[in-house]
C-alpha cells in the first residue's frame, strides 16, 4: 500500500488488489463500496467512468498495457481510479504496479500539484507507456514481413497472426481510453477545473487520440499483410492443384495407348520386332503434345 500527501491537503492512496482479497477491511476503511471492488478485481473490466453525484465520487477504469508479452502479444489490464474532493485512490495489481512507481516519482518531482493535475498526469503516463510497445511491434512486424518474403512458413504465418490478434486488442483498449477522456470533458466537474488542469486533460486526450491512430494504422498494415499472404497461399495451392491435374491426365495416356494392344483385334506394329519401341515413341509424342496443349490452356 502507498499513502502520500501532496498539494494543498490532498492525498493519494494506492491499494493492491491482492490486499483487498486478503484484508476485506481495507475497502471499508477507505469507504470503497462493493461495486468498486468488483471493478478493481475484474481483469476483464472495460474502460469506463462513473460519477456518483451524492457522494461526489468519480470512478475511472483505465486500460494499462502489461509490461510483458503473453502468448507472443501484449495485453492490457484495467486500473481503477477513485477521485474525491481531496483524495485519489488507485487500485492496482501485479500487472500494472509499474505505473504506481511512475506516479510516485511524479509526486516526488512535483509535490505541489493539484489533485486533478496529478490524476490527468497519471492517465497521460499510462498512455505514454503504450508508445514504446507499439514501436516494438512495428519493428517485429517488419521483421516478420521480411521473413515471409524470403520464405512463407507456418512459424512466420503464426507470428503474423499473433501480431494481428494483439493489435486488435490494443486498438480496442486505446479506443476505450480515448472515449473515457472524452467523457471526462462532459462531466460537471470539468467546468470547475482550473486552466492548468483543463490543459492537462486536453493534452492527455491528444496523446490518447494519437495512440488510437497509431495502433489503428499498425492493425491495418498487419491485416493488409495477412490478406496478401493468404492470396499468395491460395494462388500457390491453385497452381499445385493445376499441376497435379496435368500429371494425372498425362499418366492416363500410356494406359490408353497400350490398352489397344490388349484387345482381340488386329493392331498395327504387333508383328514388328521393334514394335514396342515405336509404341513407346508414340506414347512419348502424345504426352509431349498433351503437355504443351494443357499448359497453354491453363495459362489462359
Question: Where does each model-flagged region fall?
Answer:
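Hydrophobic helical segment of the DHp/HisKA dimerization and phosphotransfer domain
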Residues: 141, 178-181, 185-188, 222, ...
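Hydrophobic alpha-helical transmembrane segments and their immediately adjacent juxtamembrane loops
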Residues: 28, 209-300
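Peripheral, non-transmembrane regulatory/ligand-interaction domains of membrane transport proteins
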Residues: 1-186, 192-193, 203, 210, ...
Amino acid at each position: 500500500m502507498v499513502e502520500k500527501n501532496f498539494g494543498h491537503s490532498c492525498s493519494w492512496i494506492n491499494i493492491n488488489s491482492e490486499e483487498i482479497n486478503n484484508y476485506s477491511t481495507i475497502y471499508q476503511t477507505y469507504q470503497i463500496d462493493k461495486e468498486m471492488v468488483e471493478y478493481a478485481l475484474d481483469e476483464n473490466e472495460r474502460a469506463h467512468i462513473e460519477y456518483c453525484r451524492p457522494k461526489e465520487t468519480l470512478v475511472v477504469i483505465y486500460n494499462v498495457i502489461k509490461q510483458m508479452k503473453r502468448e507472443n502479444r501484449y495485453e492490457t489490464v484495467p486500473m481503477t481510479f477513485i477521485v474525491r474532493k481531496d483524495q485519489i485512490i488507485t487500485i492496482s495489481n501485479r500487472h500494472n504496479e509499474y505505473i504506481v512507481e511512475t506516479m510516485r516519482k511524479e509526486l516526488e518531482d512535483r509535490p505541489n500539484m493539484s489533485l486533478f493535475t496529478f490524476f490527468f498526469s497519471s492517465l497521460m503516463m499510462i498512455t505514454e507507456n503504450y508508445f514504446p510497445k507499439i514501436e516494438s511491434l512495428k519493428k517485429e512486424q517488419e521483421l516478420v514481413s521480411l521473413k515471409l518474403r524470403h520464405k512463407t512458413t507456418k512459424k512466420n504465418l503464426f507470428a503474423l497472426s499473433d501480431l494481428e490478434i494483439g493489435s486488435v486488442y490494443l486498438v480496442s483498449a486505446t479506443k476505450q481510453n480515448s472515449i473515457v477522456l472524452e467523457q471526462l470533458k462532459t462531466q460537471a466537474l470539468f467546468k470547475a477545473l482550473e486552466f492548468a488542469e483543463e490543459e492537462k486533460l486536453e493534452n492527455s486526450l491528444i496523446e490518447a487520440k494519437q495512440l488510437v491512430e497509431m495502433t489503428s494504422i499498425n492493425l491495418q498494415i498487419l491485416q493488409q499483410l495477412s490478406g496478401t499472404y493468404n492470396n499468395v497461399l491460395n494462388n500457390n495451392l491453385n497452381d499445385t492443384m493445376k499441376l497435379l491435374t496435368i500429371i494425372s491426365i498425362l499418366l492416363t495416356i500410356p494406359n490408353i495407348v497400350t490398352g489397344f494392344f490388349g484387345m482381340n483385334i488386329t493392331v498395327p506394329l504387333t508383328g514388328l520386332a521393334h514394335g514396342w519401341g515405336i509404341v513407346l515413341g508414340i506414347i512419348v509424342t502424345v504426352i509431349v503434345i498433351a503437355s504443351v496443349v494443357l499448359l497453354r490452356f491453363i495459362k489462359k
